């Protein structure tokens, strides 16, 4: 009887410990999500403090300069209407740092939205790649999945990107789920024909046929996030569009 009583109490303690740990973990996750949203709202307040101010091509907008005072790695701002995607873009010397840090250089599970370290600051490459986590709370790049709904794409065929010097409208021409086995993150191409071949391949991946005309002379932007529904480890959700100067 004593052994059964001991085992029963031990099992109760184990279950209680698991329950408390799970509660702590959920609480920490909620706190981190809230903190992440707060600091992003702080950045947005700086960026939108004078809504009447627009970027004059060739001149860095004052609000963007103010953001760069907070972190010199800020290189632009990305906005997709009717989504949570309205974020500063950062760029480091590698593609690892901002996976795990916010723009205040704090460790953060949500990381930041960031540009591939191989890309130049002012869209001189053929393919500029921007990464972000697919967060369960709907933040960061989670809303890219909205583009799997054709009605959403029809209503939102473009998104906006402001770099340090230029405002861009991005015309979406490809939406697809894939895995890391498909190498869509090439930034530069030796010849125009190589880029044209690449464009043909990504168009074939797309779940929609696009009317956007994109050629080897154009420059594109690629938005990439994890897609666990496609493949838990290697799945990716990708949106690609042609850069057009506003």
Curated annotation (Swiss-Prot):
Entry EC no(s): 3.4.22.-
Protein name per Swiss-Prot or TrEMBL: Sortase B
GO cellular-component term (any): plasma membrane
Localization of this protein: Cell membrane
GO BP terms, alphabetized: cellular response to iron ion
UniProt record similarity statement: Belongs to the bacterial sortase family. Class B subfamily.
Factors inducing expression: Strongly expressed in mid-log phase, cotranscribed with lmo2182 and lmo2180, the sixth gene in a possible lmo2186-lmo2180 operon. Induced under iron-deficient conditions and when fur (lmo1956, AC Q8Y5U9) is deleted. Induced when bacteria are grown in human cell lines. Decreased hemin-binding and hemin uptake by whole bacteria.
Membrane-protein topology: Single-pass membrane protein
TM regions (residue ranges): 5-24
Keyword Plastid: no
Leading EC class: hydrolase
SUPFAM superfamilies: Sortase
Swiss-Prot/TrEMBL keywords: Cell membrane, Hydrolase, Membrane, Transmembrane, Transmembrane helix
One matching Pfam family: Sortase
Effect of inactivating the gene: No visible phenotype in growth, no change in cell wall-anchoring of InlA, no effect on bacterial growth within host cells nor on virulence in a mouse infection model. Loss of cell wall-anchoring of Hbp2 (SvpA); Hbp2 is still secreted and runs with an apparent lower molecular weight in gels. A double srtA-srtB deletion mutant has no cell wall-anchored proteins. No cell wall anchoring of Hbp1 or Hbp2 (SvpA). Does not impair iron transport. Decreased binding and uptake of hemin at low (0.5 uM and 5 uM) but not high hemin concentrations (at 50 uM no effect is seen).
Function per UniProt: Transpeptidase that anchors surface proteins to the cell wall. Recognizes and modifies its substrate by proteolytic cleavage of a C-terminal sorting signal. Following cleavage, a covalent intermediate is formed via a thioester bond between the sortase and its substrate, which is then transferred and covalently attached to the cell wall. Catalyzes a cell wall sorting reaction in which a surface protein with the consensus sorting signal NP(Q/K)(T/S)(N/G/S)(D/A) is cleaved between the fourth and fifth residues, and the fourth position is linked to the cell wall.
Record-level Gene Ontology MF annotations: hydrolase activity
Taxonomic path: Bacteria, Bacillati, Bacillota, Bacilli, Bacillales
Gene3D superfamilies, per the entry: Sortase
């Amino acid at each position: 009887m004593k052994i059964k009583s001991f085992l029963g109490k031990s099992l109760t303690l184990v279950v209680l410990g698991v329950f408390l740990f799970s509660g702590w973990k959920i609480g920490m996750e909620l706190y981190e999500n809230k903190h992440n949203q707060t600091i992003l709202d702080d950045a947005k307040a700086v960026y939108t403090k004078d809504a009447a101010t627009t970027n004059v091509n060739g001149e860095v907008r004052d609000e963007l300069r103010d953001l760069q005072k907070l972190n010199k790695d800020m290189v632009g701002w990305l906005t997709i209407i009717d989504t949570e995607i309205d974020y500063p873009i950062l760029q480091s010397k590698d593609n690892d740092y901002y996976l795990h840090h916010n723009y205040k250089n704090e460790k953060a599970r949500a990381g930041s939205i960031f540009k591939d370290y191989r890309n130049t600051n002012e869209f001189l490459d053929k393919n500029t790649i921007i990464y972000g986590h697919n967060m369960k709370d709907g933040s960061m790049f989670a809303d890219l999945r909205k583009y799997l709904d054709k009605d959403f794409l029809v209503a939102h065929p473009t998104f906006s990107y402001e770099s340090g010097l230029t405002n861009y409208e991005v015309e979406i021409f490809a939406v697809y789920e894939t895995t890391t086995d498909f190498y869509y993150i090439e930034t530069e191409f030796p010849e125009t024909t190589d880029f044209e071949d690449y464009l043909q391949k990504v168009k074939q991946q797309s779940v929609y046929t696009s009317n956007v005309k994109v050629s080897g002379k154009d420059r594109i932007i690629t938005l990439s996030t994890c897609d666990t529904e496609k493949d838990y480890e290697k799945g990716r959700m990708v949106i690609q569009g042609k850069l057009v100067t506003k």
